[in-house]
UniProtKB/Swiss-Prot annotation:
Bias (Low complexity) ranges: 63-76
Domain cDENN FLCN/SMCR8-type span(s) in chain numbering: 339-491
Free-text description of this protein's post-translational modifications in UniProt: Phosphorylation by ULK1 modulates the interaction with GABARAP and is required to regulate autophagy.
Recorded GO MF terms: enzyme binding; enzyme inhibitor activity; GTPase activator activity; protein-containing complex binding
Organism from which the protein derives: Bos taurus
Protein name per Swiss-Prot or TrEMBL: Folliculin
Ranges where the dDENN FLCN/SMCR8-type domain occurs: 493-558
Subunit structure, as described in the record: Interacts (via C-terminus) with FNIP1 or FNIP2 (via C-terminus). Component of the lysosomal folliculin complex (LFC), composed of FLCN, FNIP1 (or FNIP2), RagA/RRAGA or RagB/RRAGB GDP-bound, RagC/RRAGC or RagD/RRAGD GTP-bound, and Ragulator. Interaction with FNIP1 or FNIP2 mediates indirect interaction with the PRKAA1, PRKAB1 and PRKAG1 subunits of 5'-AMP-activated protein kinase (AMPK). Interacts with HSP90AA1 in the presence of FNIP1. Interacts with HSP70, STUB1, CDC37, AHSA1, CCT2, STIP1, PTGES3 and PPP5C.
Site location (Essential for GTPase activation (GAP) activity): R164
Region (Disordered): 32-82, 294-321
Length: 579
């Protein structure tokens, strides 16, 4: 966790003071700087760019350098400190714990070495023991801002038989620049810091009771003459926390507790990528997968029933059946016939546009978006398959019905992408229909091959593509809005293929949202045509091509979404009259 945890004390002589703090070091220390739980030395590094971080970076130095660094330390001078303001003895190097899992080091000093961090901790210390106090002056509170960091502070009292009111005022603070993270960590920090405080108070209470039992001070205090000036009691008003708790290893224990607190709090909350609700494509794919699983289960059950009902085979029949198996269906023949995929394939929509030409590609894309049947005739089945793989990215998953390669024509209601071999005859009414487009792939002539260039460099140059349709309106009309935006992205050479793909995904999501609104408006609510026209104008889809596109894409909505809408409409709350 990128934070600082500090123990603060309100001294009767010097006011709020920072006693002990633990910070996180993300940079590895050189050899000799200490490893594990041990002592180490540090000096402030150069200020990091990009704002203040809740950690600093240190490097090892010699004792002579440590002395010079101590003289230039941002902390208070020795003359301004008493026993109650000081935690580590003069020349104490501090504590370092090394987390081998994350290569992070937790370093504890009395003050942060970085001047800006010292200022932040100092200000938080003063505010936690002066103005930012919860009712009762003992308990947790949250304060801070973007400039000086956000602070979780828990104030508490420690028993002292020589102090005013027999107690001294302390606080444990956790400083972080991330407000949301600190607020979310409130319950965890409150419980763990409260445990540290209870342990300190328990040790101090035992010392207090022992001192009171050995030498009661209450009568002496009550008889002391009043004076408006601060003065020491029994010559030692400023007692260190180690003497109050009678624990010489107190600071080492606090270092361990603070280091564990920083590590545990950082490991407790982790960032996760929230993808939101599943898209329509995801829902449709899940439904298709479920249907395939149901079909496979039904086939397995039917085969099991046939085996149970069938007569017992004579001895040796299984061997004869295996020998009758045709060579085409054997696994060995399939593996032997496997070859690497050919290079004569389309790689992307931009590649297809370059090969077909802008006018032919626009005609083809228009028919794809409108839901018309797209027929490819070629001897190369891999080429047809790659063309369909590229073209299907323009449509939602639910609108795609593909027959990759067939030896006979299939009707449009069965597929909107159909691959045929060259000898297959297409019915005349389909060729003349405005709801179909045919792409015929021919072998290029010798002259065109030399004109285009080397066949090995451009494998698709050995083909000629002829795009025909019974309706030439695709090239004449303005076309659907999504087609115009798509062509603008494809023609922009500053956009890479990956960026164009993401742009296409965003365009499909935008128009699928419009499809959902139109479906809810027309199919579920059954609004009149006048209201539907107003809605289309608001959606920016009042043109004829846009309306056709929305109606076709409506068929690609998932069954889950449709059933959810219908169940919502039929619920009692939905049947209440509208105000």
């Amino acid at each position: 966790m990128n934070a600082i945890v500090a123990l603060c004390h309100f001294c009767e002589l010097h006011g709020p003071r920072t006693l002990f703090c633990t910070e996180v070091l993300h940079a590895p220390l050189p050899q000799g700087a200490g490893s594990g739980d041990g002592a180490g030395r540090g000096e402030p590094a150069d200020e990091e760019e990009g704002g203040i971080q809740m950690s600093s970076r240190i490097r090892a130095h010699s004792p002579a350098e440590g002395a010079s660094a101590e003289s230039s330390s941002p902390g208070p001078k020795k003359s301004d400190m008493c026993e109650g303001c000081r935690s580590l003895a003069a020349g104490h190097p501090g504590y370092i714990s090394h987390d081998k899992e994350t290569s992070i080091k937790y370093v504890s000093h009395q003050h942060p070495n970085h001047p800006q961090l010292f200022s932040i901790v100092r200000q938080a210390c003063v505010r936690s023991l002066s103005c930012e106090v919860c009712p009762g002056r003992e308990g947790p509170i949250f304060f801070g801002d973007e400039q000086h960091g956000f602070v979780f502070s828990h104030t508490f009292f420690i028993k002292d038989s020589l102090a005013r009111g027999f107690q001294r005022w302390y606080s444990i603070i956790a400083i972080m620049m991330d407000r949301i993270y600190l607020i979310n960590s409130w319950p965890f920090l409150l419980g763990k810091i409260r445990g540290i405080i209870d342990e300190l108070q328990g040790k101090a209470l035992k010392v207090f009771e022992a001192e009171q039992f050995g030498c009661p001070q209450r009568a002496q205090r009550m008889n002391t003459a009043f004076t408006p000036f601060l003065h020491q009691r029994n010559g030692n008003a400023a007692r260190s926390l180690t003497s109050l708790t009678n624990d010489d290893s107190l600071w080492a224990c606090l270092h361990t507790s603070f280091a564990w607190l920083l590590k545990a709090c950082g490991s407790r909350l982790t960032e996760k990528l929230l993808e939101g609700a599943p898209t329509e494509d995801t829902l449709v794919q899940m439904e298709q997968l479920a249907e395939l699983e149901e079909e496979s289960e039904s086939w397995d059950n039917s085969e099991a029933e046939e085996e149970e009902k069938g007569p017992a085979l004579p001895e040796g029949a299984e061997g004869r059946e295996l020998t009758k198996c045709p060579a085409e269906s054997s696994l060995l023949s399939d593996c032997g016939a496997w070859q690497p995929r050919k290079l004569s394939v389309f790689k992307s929509l931009r590649h297809m546009r370059q090969v077909l030409g802008a006018p032919s590609f626009r005609t083809l894309a228009w028919h794809v978006l409108m839901g018309n049947q797209v027929i490819w005739k070629s001897r190369d089945s891999d080429l047809v398959h790659s063309a369909f793989e590229v073209l299907r990215t323009m449509l939602p998953v639910g609108c795609v019905r593909v027959i990759p390669y067939s030896s006979q024509y299939e009707e449009a209601y069965r597929c909107n992408f159909l691959g045929l071999s060259p000898h297959v005859q297409i019915p005349p009414h389909v060729l003349a229909s405005e709801f179909a487009v045919v792409v015929e792939v021919h072998t290029a002539t010798r002259s065109s091959l030399h004109a285009v260039g080397c066949e090995s460099e451009q494998p698709l140059s050995k083909y000629e593509f002829v795009v025909t349709s019974g309706s030439p309106v695709a090239a004449d009309r303005v076309g659907p809005t999504i087609l115009n935006k798509m062509e603008a992205a494809l023609t922009n050479q500053n956009l890479s293929v990956d960026v164009v793909d993401q742009c296409l995904v965003c365009l499909k999501e935008e128009w699928m949202n419009k499809v959902k609104v139109l479906f809810k408006f027309t199919k579920v609510d059954s609004r009149p045509k006048e209201d539907t026209q107003k809605l289309l104008s608001i959606l920016g889809a009042s043109e004829e091509d846009n309306v056709k596109l929305l109606k076709f894409w409506m068929t690609g909505l998932s069954k889950t979404y449709k059933s959810h809408l219908m169940s919502t409409v039929r619920s009692p709350t939905a049947l209440e009259p509208r105000n």
